[in-house]
C-alpha cells in the first residue's frame, strides 16, 4: 500500500518508523472504518451539493467510498500501520481506487472533526444494542419474578437475616436498577446524537458548507453549535463509561448473591451447567465462574472510566493528541457490557430456585422479630419498649434454641401480657410477608401489581 502523510508539507525530516508506530492508532480505530466511510460519503455529497467541488467529482468520490464499504463488508480491506489511523488509511485506499480526485474529499474538513464524527457515529450505532439487551434482561427478570411472586425467603441487611421477603420482590429490585440504567443509556443518546463535522480543526471553515444536510444524511438529531466544543467534547463517551460502570456495579452485586446463594451453605439456587465450570482436581466442584467473571470485569469498566476522566481532566481547548486514548476504553467496555448482559440473561433464564430451602431459612432465624414488635405497638406498647421486650425474647430463644413462633404462649405473655394467641399467625413467614402492603412493600399482591407495572413500562418501549 502506498503511504503518505496528510500533513507532510510542513516538515523537512521524516520520523523514524518506530516513532510513527507509537503514534499510530489504526490497530484499534479500524473499528470505526464503517463510520469513517459513512461520514465521508455524507461529506462528499454535501461538497457537491454546495458546489464546493463539482457534482461529478462528488459522485466519483461517493462511488469510490461505496466500493470501499463493500470491500470492508466482504473482509477485503487491508489497513497499514504506516498510514497512522483509519482516516488516512481510507483516504489512501480511496486514492488508489479513483486517483487524485480523492484528495478533494478533505476539503472543509479536519481530522479533528472527522474523528469526533466517527466516534459519535460508532457509539450512536451501538447504544440501541445496549438498550435492547437491557430490555431482554428485564423481561427475563420479570418472567422469573412472576414465577416466584410468592416464594418466601430471608431478606438481608449487613448480610444478616433481617425480615422475610419474596424472591419475586428481590428480583424486582434489580428490575428497578436496570430501569435506571436503561434511562441513563437512553439519555446518553441525546448527547451522542450530535454532529461535530463542520467544525474543521477548531474554528469552523470559510467554505459554504451545509452542516444540517450532513446531519440529516447521517441521522444526527442536532449539530454542535460551537466549533471548539465540537472537536474537544468527549462527554458522550464519558457518559457511556459512567453509565456502563453503574450497570456493571448492579450486575456485580447480583453476581455476588448468585455466587453466595449457590453454595452449600445457602443452597438457595443452582446455576445450570451451561453457566458453571468444574475443577481440574476436585471432582465435586461446580463453580459460578461466569458470575465471577462479570464481577471481575466490573473493575475493568471502572478502570476505563477513570482512565478517560484522567486523560481529559487537564486538556486545554481544543483538540489534543491525548484524545487518541479515548477510544480503546469505549470499544472494550461496549463489548464487555453487551457480553455481561447476555451472560446474565442466559444465566437467569436457566436458574433453578430451591423454594423449600428459601422458606426454611426464615423459620429459625428470628427474622419475624419485627412482626412481634409491630404487634405489641398495635397493642399500645411504645415501639422502643416493644423493641426491647422482643430483643430479650430473641436472646432467650437463641440460648434455648427456640424460635419465637415455637415459644409457649405463657412464656411470651410473661414478657408482654398484651400478647394473645393470634400471635402465632402473625409470626408465620407468609403472614409477615403479606402484611407488608405499603407501596413498594413485599406483599405478594404488591409484587404482582409491580410486575404488571414494569411489564407496561417494557411494552411502552415498543
Curated annotation (Swiss-Prot):
Pfam families: ASL_C2, Lyase_1
Domain of life: Bacteria
Entry EC number(s): 4.3.2.1
Catalysed reactions, as listed in the record: 2-(N(omega)-L-arginino)succinate = fumarate + L-arginine
Alphabetic keyword roster: Amino-acid biosynthesis, Arginine biosynthesis, Cytoplasm, Lyase
GO MF annotations, alphabetized: argininosuccinate lyase activity
One GO biological process term: L-arginine biosynthetic process
Disulfide bonds: none
Main localisation: cytoplasm
Transmembrane segments: none
Gene Ontology CC entries for this record: cytosol
Record-linked InterPro entries: Arg_succ_lyase_C, Argininosuccinate_lyase, Fumarase/histidase_N, Fumarate_lyase_CS, Fumarate_lyase_fam, Fumarate_lyase_N, L-Aspartase-like
Associated pathway: Amino-acid biosynthesis; L-arginine biosynthesis; L-arginine from L-ornithine and carbamoyl phosphate: step 3/3
Family: Belongs to the lyase 1 family. Argininosuccinate lyase subfamily.
Protein name: Argininosuccinate lyase
Amino acid at each position: 500500500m502506498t503511504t503518505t502523510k496528510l500533513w507532510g508539507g510542513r516538515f523537512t525530516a521524516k520520523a523514524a518508523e518506530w516513532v510513527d508506530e507509537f503514534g499510530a492508532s489504526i490497530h484499534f480505530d479500524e473499528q470505526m472504518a464503517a463510520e469513517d466511510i459513512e461520514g465521508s460519503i455524507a461529506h462528499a455529497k454535501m461538497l457537491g451539493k454546495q458546489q464546493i467541488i463539482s457534482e461529478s467529482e462528488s459522485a466519483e468520490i461517493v462511488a469510490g467510498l461505496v466500493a470501499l464499504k463493500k470491500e470492508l463488508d466482504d473482509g477485503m480491506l487491508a489497513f497499514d500501520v504506516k498510514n497512522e489511523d483509519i482516516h488516512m488509511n481510507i483516504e489512501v485506499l480511496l486514492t488508489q481506487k479513483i486517483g487524485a480526485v480523492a484528495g478533494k474529499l478533505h476539503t472543509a474538513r479536519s481530522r479533528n472533526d472527522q474523528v469526533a464524527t466517527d466516534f459519535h457515529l460508532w457509539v450512536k450505532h451501538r447504544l440501541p444494542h445496549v438498550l435492547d439487551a437491557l430490555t431482554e434482561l428485564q423481561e427475563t427478570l420479570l418472567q422469573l419474578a412472576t414465577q416466584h411472586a410468592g416464594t418466601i425467603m430471608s431478606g438481608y441487611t449487613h448480610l444478616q437475616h433481617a425480615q422475610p421477603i419474596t424472591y419475586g420482590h428481590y428480583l424486582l429490585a434489580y428490575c428497578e436498577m436496570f430501569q435506571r440504567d436503561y434511562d441513563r443509556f437512553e439519555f446518553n443518546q441525546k448527547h451522542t446524537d450530535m454532529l461535530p463535522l463542520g467544525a474543521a480543526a477548531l474554528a469552523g471553515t470559510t467554505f459554504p458548507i451545509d452542516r444540517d444536510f450532513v446531519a440529516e444524511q447521517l441521522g444526527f438529531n442536532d449539530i454542535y453549535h460551537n466549533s471548539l466544543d465540537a472537536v474537544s467534547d468527549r462527554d458522550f463517551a464519558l457518559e457511556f463509561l459512567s453509565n456502563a460502570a453503574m450497570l456493571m456495579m448492579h450486575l456485580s452485586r447480583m453476581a455476588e448473591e448468585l455466587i453466595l446463594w449457590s453454595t452449600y451453605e445457602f443452597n438457595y439456587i443452582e446455576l445450570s451447567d451451561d453457566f458453571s465450570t468444574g475443577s481440574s482436581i476436585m471432582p465435586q466442584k461446580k463453580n459460578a465462574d461466569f458470575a465471577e467473571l462479570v464481577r471481575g470485569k466490573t473493575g475493568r469498566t471502572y478502570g476505563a472510566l477513570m482512565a478517560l476522566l484522567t486523560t481529559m481532566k487537564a486538556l486545554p481547548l481544543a483538540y489534543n493528541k491525548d484524545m487518541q486514548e479515548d477510544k480503546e476504553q469505549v470499544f472494550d467496555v461496549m463489548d464487555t457490557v453487551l457480553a455481561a448482559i447476555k451472560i446474565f440473561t442466559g444465566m437467569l433464564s436457566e436458574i433453578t430456585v430451591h423454594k423449600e430451602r428459601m422458606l426454611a431459612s426464615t423459620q429459625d432465624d428470628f427474622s419475624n422479630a419485627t412482626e412481634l414488635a409491630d404487634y405489641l405497638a398495635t397493642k399500645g406498647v411504645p415501639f422502643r419498649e416493644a423493641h426491647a421486650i422482643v430483643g430479650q425474647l430473641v436472646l432467650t430463644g437463641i440460648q434455648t434454641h427456640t424460635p419465637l413462633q415455637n415459644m409457649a404462649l405463657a412464656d411470651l405473655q410473661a414478657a408482654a401480657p398484651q400478647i394473645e394467641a393470634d400471635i402465632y399467625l402473625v409470626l408465620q413467614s407468609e403472614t409477615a410477608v403479606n402484611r407488608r402492603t405499603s407501596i413498594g412493600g413485599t406483599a405478594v399482591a404488591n409484587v404482582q401489581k409491580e410486575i404488571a407495572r414494569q411489564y407496561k413500562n417494557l411494552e411502552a418501549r415498543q
